[in-house]
């Protein structure tokens, strides 16, 4: 019994890696991700002069649906500030159904995504980041160091009632070469389906 428990703990800890900490270098920068346009690219290729924003997302999570109307404005803010933006679908267990590549293409078109939406086969990138939720955001500066991780803002239900724009504030700080004041927040969302 103890042997089974030990093996189970080892297996589970291998699946759920520890989340990367502030100041960490971008993991998996050279993993290839398939974008909905059919091209395969790496995080290094998505990164721009002032950094990269990575959002772990999906097609059906109610939390993603609540926040996704903010994705395009965030993408625009990133573009304005010379920060790359990529959304990553790591729901491996659902890649043959509601989070299939074809469904991703449909979802992106239906929501007028203006940014890369990529497939993380086998959830390799999510595991490297220690990401566990959708949406789960990670902002890296121009030298590839993590400066913010967590939630988009403080109100998933109503964009008009947002009081704290954690991600937008972090993007603005990074683009000005300033320190991010709020470095971590709790990512609220559905679990990534490894």
Label every PLM stretch briefly:
Residues 18-44:
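N-terminal "domain-start" segment that seeds a small globular fold
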Residues 58-67, 137, 188-193:
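Short, thiol/selenol-centered motifs that function as redox-active sites or metal-ligating centers
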Residues 44-65, 171:
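Short active-site neighborhood of thiol/selenol oxidoreductases, capturing the structured segment around
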Residues 49-52, 80-85, 112-116, 142-143:
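Loop/turn elements at helix/coil->beta-strand transitions in domains of secreted/extracellular proteins
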